[in-house]
Amino acid sequence: MAREHQAAILPQPGGPLSVGMRPTPKPGPNDVLIEVKAVALNPCDYYQRDYGMPPVLIYPAVLGSDTAGVVVKLGSNVTTVPGPGSRVIAFASSFYQGGSPDHGAFQTYTLAQSEGVIPLPDSLSFEEGAVFPLAVLTALTAWTTIGMRLDTRYSPVDQQAVLIWGASSSVGSFAVQSAKTLGFTIYATASPEHHDLVKTLGADAVFDYKAGDVVSQIVSAVRRDGVQLHTAHCVVDGALQPTLDILKETKGDAPAKVAHSPVLPEGHPTLDNTQIIFNFPSLDEVARSKHMKEVFHGWLNLSLQTGEIVSSPNIQVENGGLSAVHAALDKLKNGVSGTKIVVAL
């Protein structure tokens, strides 16, 4: 095993990232040491780089969370992860590890807690596998945040519907796919050029979020279909007010629940008899680890085996290894649509 490895290091708040050498860590009892083959980028990565939010606790820092790679070594207590040489998907975030740079994704060797490491199917490339971890965790946490079990299976007789606002984003695409496994009738919003993609992922109807009458369009569709819509996931900023406008017309006297993935601003809009909950995993280590095991070893692993879930959205691969990460984050910050940026290592 290598004594040192390359990492894209954030030396101080504001960056820039630069490639340097770090000592290769040994896995703790519950860790998996992974040789990283591909990393996917998320908006929180450039927020941490540029603004230190979510909080970066230790500098120099290694950012990132989404990886696919090969198992190098298992911690002494790890029994649920395949052994050395196995291809895996891994959630490798330093945020939940006290800022430890040994756990960040943007390096050629990283540690990940075993609850977030599962086999990568042979049918998927490392680049395709890297898109899953944070987006799936966020999408699935939205359901448990509003009190749903991940083994829920509605039937058409139940007539349960959900609204997903921002469905062509990475999180949104997995929100749609997971909603399908839960048995919801799915109403989704996206830019028109992404409607076909969102439908292939499982949405029953997709609407242009920029349309001036999008609220009335969705309300009319819900009434026409005769379903009950009192559940929603706001994946993107700007979604809450139109979501509440729709629920006001569709929920009737039933209580409604909204999972909100962006941070809720002060003074955000509200609706009577409607819970609006910030979507974020528990900060309690025991509860979070249990939830991660349910998400990754339970739901995602099974869904990949059965083919109920696919890699989404479309990936844009950036070559150049770790040296390309900083510029790729700038590209993400400047805006991409219906695309997940992945850097091949």
UniProtKB/Swiss-Prot annotation:
Q: What's a single GO MF annotation on this record?
A: nucleotide binding
Organism, scientific name: Aspergillus flavipes
Q: Which UniProt keywords apply?
A: NADP, Nucleotide-binding, Oxidoreductase
Gene Ontology BP annotations = terpenoid biosynthetic process
Specify the protein name.
Trans-enoyl reductase tndF
Q: Does the keyword Nucleotide-binding apply?
A: yes
Would you identify the family this protein belongs to, as annotated? Belongs to the zinc-containing alcohol dehydrogenase family.
Extract the ranges annotated as region (Disordered): 1-26
Q: Which domain of life is it from?
A: Eukaryota
Binding annotation for NADP(+): 44-49, 168-171, 191-194, 209, 244-245
**Recorded metabolic or biological pathway in which this protein acts:** Secondary metabolite biosynthesis; terpenoid biosynthesis
Q: What is its EC number?
A: 1.-.-.-
CDD domains associated with the record: enoyl_reductase_like
Question: Which SUPFAM superfamilies does the protein's record reference?
Answer: GroES-like, NAD(P)-binding Rossmann-fold domains
Functional note? Trans-enoyl reductase; part of the gene cluster that mediates the biosynthesis of talaronoid C, a fusicoccane diterpenoid with an unprecedented tricyclic 5/8/6 ring system. The first step in the pathway is performed by the fusicoccadiene synthase tndC that possesses both prenyl transferase and terpene cyclase activity, converting isopentenyl diphosphate and dimethylallyl diphosphate into geranylgeranyl diphosphate (GGDP) and further converting GGDP into talarodiene, a precursor for talaronoid C.
